[in-house]
From Swiss-Prot:
Disruption phenotype: Short siliques and low fertility due to defect in meiosis. Keywords: Chromosome, DNA recombination, Meiosis, Nucleus, Repeat, TPR repeat. InterPro entries: Spo22/ZIP4, Spo22/ZIP4/TEX11, TPR-like_helical_dom_sf, TPR_rpt. It is found in: Nucleus; Chromosome. TPR repeats lie at residues 134-167, 223-260, 278-311, 443-476, 484-517, 879-912. It comes from Arabidopsis thaliana. Required for meiotic chromosome segregation. It is involved in interference-sensitive crossovers (class I meiotic crossover) formation, in both male and female meiosis. Is specific to recombination events resulting in interference-sensitive crossovers (class I meiotic crossover). Not required for synapsis completion. The gene is ZIP4. This is TPR repeat-containing protein ZIP4. SMART domains: TPR. The lineage of its organism: Eukaryota, Viridiplantae, Streptophyta, Embryophyta, Tracheophyta. Pfam families: SPO22, TPR_8.
Length: 936
């Protein structure tokens, strides 16, 4: 504010005296600068050089003290007042521009004006010059304080205090001057508080107690300042020191209120002191609450509510139920706390933020047990007054808390919130566009809670929360995707609950809003769990038609089908998966893995061997087309895959063979030979051996099928068998030439020989038949039993070959005779067989001689044997057949030939037990025959 010019008679006299004197040059310079400050327009900023220049001239002026006369001082006084008034005008203009730099310059200019007035403070003729000088410093200090220039403010306040300290307070009668003494102390105290000199600040307030002068206004000012410092300490922190300071300062404020009531002379003063006292008590309650002194809080609240100690009525401030509730909670008396909380519903003066905070505080302490109370309070408030969407969001979020789901407490909280947010009034709070942000937030809160319960496998609670979150998604085009997402997760929840029909309803709704692969896949899962396999297989085709389809979903579908034991569905899914490889599309999984998985699935299901064979054939075809490294993979990985396919074919072929499924057995074993052929043969030759085994058993299965079906092999089948055996023969020949025949089982070589004989007999290749048997006879694997079987088979099969049979049986006979302990029954059998073959296929005299030689060989074998060592029946057969062979030569007159047969028959009979009667007759006949021949 501007300070009026002094117009007393004495000053007018001094003014005339001053005008009669010539101004000092320094004063003239100062006046020129003041005129500049007065001439500055409102739109112009104060030059920064002006305060500096004035300060320099003032410094020079101070060097002239003491001043020569009173008129000189009066001139300085007037210049100071002019400068001050100019500062007031400049400050008013600067306030419109809000320039901090300009405000600081004006404050500096004020400081110059105060210093100028201080130089002439002992001027005569001016009332209370000392008080006025002090006032300039006080007001300048206030400006510096507002600019947060606390050091400069403190300097000004201290200078003002020094000036008035020389005045006897008892002699002051003016109320304004008395107020200045108090205000100076309060201002110094505030500045000291700001620069964290708390002790000085409190000391100055305590000094101010001596400057009250019984004035109600003084009591109010000092009490308010104590309260302000107490609030500052309370807000500074929760440490005991800060809280104790706050309590001490507030008690001082309360004490001053009590004393101030005694000085009140008007109803207005009494009302103000009462309001201050109530306010201070509330803050004291807050401090006790912070300190955990809950009993003291309750006492304060009771005092306030009872309206005691001079109060006209009970205090109904909105903070009281909150303070009381928190205190009761601190004392563990939850029922009283609940009463306070419910009582807030009927208090219309309680702001929304306060009761929401109270609900949060109550629930934080009581926890899950307070969920219903929190809901009831909120709905009660909803029916009483307007509640914002933000408040509803806060309550829902607080009740849900940070629970991760899965426990009973979080389930109860979720159920309470579900009831709360599904209330039509709550939903209506979020309906307008103005609360879009809050609507998204509460949807997120509900969604996250549902997700937590879903992860904890509490699908029932999760479904409820997801359903409630759908209430906060608008039914417009922009939110179609969000609604579809909600329906999809609800489908997952009901899948988890095995409520498949409801899950299907939700996913169909989602598909209407946003048809995509996720919806299609979930429908597939539902069909699987409903065991509607045909629908599931149909859904596979639906998935592939989706715009966002990825082959990964087919792999995932197969896994789902396997887990549900729906093997046909898994096969259908993987079969579809294979079609993408044929098209050349880049896939995340190698083709061989898909084939392997398919075959593995099919082998688990007995009766699916035909399908498994088809996929094995496809795999072999793809391997041939792409190359083994490309199809199976490189290195050890590829080798493992090749081994798996080969071994699986072998195992399936063996299983089918045991089950007499010879057609499948043959195909699997043939494929096994192909897969084993892909493997790089190791030094041990094990893989080559497996190729031979597979081929030999494959051809064996073909012949077994022929016998089973009683249908002869076709020409194509015979040629295929021949080709397979040629391949096996080459491998065996290679192994034998390398000296590795020891690793091949003799039985395997025998089977090969037998099969080769059979198949080439069908091709009328008798020369090869003899060659293959001779080759076998010359190998280390040959045993007389094998030769015996070959000989018998060659003599009895449809493709009989007497040359092969004779060779095999002769080789067998030689081996038996050469053994240390010959098996004479077998020898006898072979001799009979050889005689029979020769008898059937004889063509000339040489054959007759060969037969005779066999009989003689049999006789030589029998010579020296113990009785019965050579089979008696076979001996009799030899003797009788030899004797009977003489009949034809006798009739033909071939007496010499007849004699040979009669003689060998008699010789053999002589070695056979039990032929004595026959032998006597034979001897008589032979003697008579010889006589007859001699006489002829």
């Amino acid at each position: 504010m501007r300070i009026a010019e002094i117009t007393t008679p004495d000053l007018r006299l001094h003014h005339r005296e001053t005008d009669s004197h010539t101004h000092h040059p320094l004063l003239s310079e100062i006046e020129l600068l003041i005129q500049q400050s007065e001439a500055i327009s409102k739109d112009q900023p104060l030059p920064q050089s002006l305060p500096i220049s004035l300060r320099q001239f003032l410094t020079r002026l101070s060097q002239l003290a003491p001043f020569p006369d009173n008129s000189f001082k009066l001139t300085i006084w007037k210049l100071s007042f002019r400068l001050w008034n100019a500062c007031v005008d400049l400050a008013n203009a600067a306030s419109l521009q809000s320039s901090l730099t300009s405000a600081e310059n004006i404050a500096n200019l004020r400081h110059v004006a105060a210093d100028m007035l201080f130089l002439a403070k002992d001027v005569t003729g001016v009332p209370s010059p000392t008080i006025k000088s002090s006032l300039f410093y006080y007001k300048t200090g206030l400006v510096y304080h507002s600019l947060k220039k606390f050091d400069l403010a403190s300097d000004c306040f201290e200078r003002a205090t020094e000036i008035v300290s020389k005045i006897d307070i008892a002699k002051i009668s003016d109320a304004g001057e008395k107020k200045l003494f108090l205000d100076l102390n309060l201002a110094r105290s505030r500045t000291a508080w700001e620069i964290s000199d708390r002790n000085l600040a409190v000391t100055l307030l305590n000094r101010a107690k001596n400057l009250l002068f019984g004035s109600p206004d003084h009591y109010k000012s000092l009490s308010n300042q104590f309260l302000a410092f107490g609030k500052s300490s309370l807000s500074r922190g929760d440490d005991d020191c800060s809280l104790n300071d706050a309590l001490r300062l507030m008690n001082e404020a309360l004490d001053l209120c009590e004393k101030g009531l005694g000085t009140a002379k008007t109803r207005e003063d009494t009302t103000e002191f009462t309001a201050m006292r109530i306010k201070t008590l509330r803050f004291i309650s807050a401090v006790h609450l912070q300190k955990g002194e809950f009993e003291n809080v309750i006492k304060c609240v009771k005092v306030l509510r009872n309206g005691g100690n001079g109060s006209d009525g009970a205090d109904q401030h909105a903070s009281l139920p909150v303070l009381a509730m928190k205190a009761w909670l601190g004392l563990g008396r939850h029922s009283e706390a609940e009463k306070e909380l419910r009582g807030m519903v009927g208090n219309n003066d309680i702001p929304e933020a306060v009761w929401v905070s109270a609900v949060e505080a109550y629930f934080e302490v009581v926890g899950t047990a307070g969920a219903e109370t929190a809901k009831g309070v909120f709905l009660g408030l909803l029916g009483r007054c307007h509640v914002s969407a933000k408040a509803a969001l806060r309550v829902a979020h607080r009740v849900l808390g940070e629970s991760r789901g899965g426990d009973n407490g979080s389930r109860i909280r979720a159920n309470v919130v579900a009831q709360l947010v599904s209330d039509e009034r709550v939903v209506a709070l979020f309906a307008s566009e103005a609360v879009t942000k809050e609507r998204k937030a509460i949807h997120s809160v509900l969604w996250n809670s549902a997700s937590d319960h879903f992860r904890a496998k509490d699908y029932e609670t999760s479904a409820e929360m997801f359903e409630k979150s759908m209430l906060y998604i608008p039914h417009d085009i922009e939110n179609r995707v969000f609604r579809a997402k909600g329906f999809r997760v609800l489908c997952l929840c009901y899948l988890g609950l095995s409520q498949l029909d409801r899950a299907l309803e939700y996913i169909e709704e989602a598909e209407k809003l946003e048809p995509n692969i996720a919806c299609s896949f979930l429908k597939f899962k539902i069909y699987l769990q409903k065991k509607e396999h045909s629908c599931a297989i149909g859904q596979i085709d639906a998935m592939t038609s989706c715009l966002d389809f990825s082959p990964d979903y087919l792999s995932l579908s197969a896994h789902e089908a396997i887990s549900c034991q729906a093997l046909p569905v898994a096969v259908a899914s993987l079969s579809k998966f294979l079609s993408f490889y044929i098209s050349g599309k880049k896939m995340p999984t190698t083709e061989v893995v898909v084939f392997r998985t398919l075959v593995t699935i099919l082998t688990q299901d007995i009766g699916s061997e035909t399908e498994a064979l088809n996929f094995m054939l496809q795999a072999q075809s793809r391997a041939s087309k792409l190359g083994t490294e490309c199809f199976f993979g490189l290195g050890e990985t590829g080798k493992r895959e090749q081994n798996w396919f080969a071994a699986t074919c072998w195992n399936l072929g063996s299983r089918c063979g045991k089950e007499k499924k010879y057609e499948l057995c043959g195909e699997f074993l043939r494929l096994a030979s192909e897969f084993y052929g892909y493997i790089d043969t190791d030094e041990s030759g094990e893989d080559k051996l497996m190729i031979c085994r597979s081929i030999i058993l494959s051809v064996t299965a073909m012949i077994a099928l022929e016998k089973q079906t009683k249908s002869a092999l076709t020409e194509t089948q015979v040629k295929l068998a021949a080709e397979l055996l040629v391949r096996a023969g080459k491998i065996m020949s290679s192994s034998l030439s390398d000296g590795k025949d020891c690793i091949m089982e003799p039985e395997l070589i025998f089977m090969y020989t037998l099969l080769a004989y059979d198949i080439h007999g069908r091709l009328n290749n008798s020369a090869f038949q003899l060659l293959v048997v001779k080759t076998f006879a010359g190998s280390k694997s040959c045993h007389y039993n094998y030769l015996l079987q070959l000989g018998i088979f060659a003599s009895q099969s449809p493709q009989s070959n007497p040359d092969v049979s004779t060779f095999a049986l002769n080789e067998c006979l030689s081996a038996l005779i050469a053994s240390a302990s010959p098996e004479y029954p077998t020898i006898a059998l072979i001799i009979r067989k050889l005689i029979s073959i020769a008898s059937v296929h004889k063509g000339d005299t040489d054959d007759e001689e060969a037969i005779l030689k066999m009989y003689k060989q049999a006789y030589r074998i029998m010579v020296g044997l113990k009785e019965g060592e050579y089979p008696t029946e076979e001996g009799k057969w030899l003797a009788m057949t030899a004797w009977n062979r003489a009949a034809l030569p006798v009739r033909l007159g071939q007496f010499e030939t007849a004699k040979k047969w009669l003689s060998i028959g008699l010789e053999i009979a002589d070695k056979v037990t039990g032929m004595d009667t026959y032998k006597a007759c034979m001897q008589d006949y032979l003697a008579g025959f010889q006589t007859k021949v001699s006489s002829a």
